């Protein structure tokens, strides 16, 4: 990204490789605590600078918001956020344990509302057509139709309707609560 923009790349946040994905951790308290151990801001790379965060996704938005707050606390003058996928609007029921629709920030807010919630100057998402094109590019393996349900709410199996989604979400909530 830095090369394409013609700017110097540097790591303003050092990542602890021993802390896992925060979006799948149970409870906001655990996610917030883990984030403090996961990322270490580098003052000289952040203070008095325009900063761009590049992340694979924004799920709930809480982790992203904390990262932005951390950068601003360390003196970033402007914060831009680039996301490598489209807004995550719906849960995946094909193997990824994701939050419910109500917990997904993009299911409830527009891109501009998310930008305001995160408190960033600019927010960029990958366009779904560009992501699909990148996934379907011919190579050793050809994919005719990738599942993009978490981005476009169009599930590839016919039995996925609103009632089924609600049932699956209820099961996940019960599992989280130990029921």
Regions found by a protein language model. Give the residues of each.
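PRPP-associated nucleotide enzymes
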Residues: 1-179
């Amino acid at each position: 990204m830095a090369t394409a923009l013609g700017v110097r790349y540097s790591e303003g946040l050092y990542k602890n490789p021993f802390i896992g994905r925060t979006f799948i951790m149970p409870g906001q308290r655990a996610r917030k605590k883990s984030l403090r151990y996961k990322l270490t801001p580098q003052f000289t790379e952040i203070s008095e600078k325009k900063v761009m965060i590049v992340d694979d996704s924004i799920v709930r938005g809480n982790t992203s918001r904390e990262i932005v707050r951390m950068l601003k606390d360390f003196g970033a003058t402007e914060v831009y956020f680039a996301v490598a996928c489209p807004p995550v609007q719906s849960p995946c029921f094909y193997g990824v344990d994701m939050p419910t629709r109500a917990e997904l920030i993009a299911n409830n807010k527009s891109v501009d509302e998310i930008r305001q919630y995160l408190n960033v100057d600019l927010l960029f998402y990958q366009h779904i057509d560009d992501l699909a094109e990148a996934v379907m590019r011919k190579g050793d393996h050809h994919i005719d139709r990738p599942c993009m349900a978490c981005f476009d709410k169009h599930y590839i199996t016919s039995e996925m309707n609103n009632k089924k989604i609600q049932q699956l979400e209820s099961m996940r909530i019960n599992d989280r609560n130990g029921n």
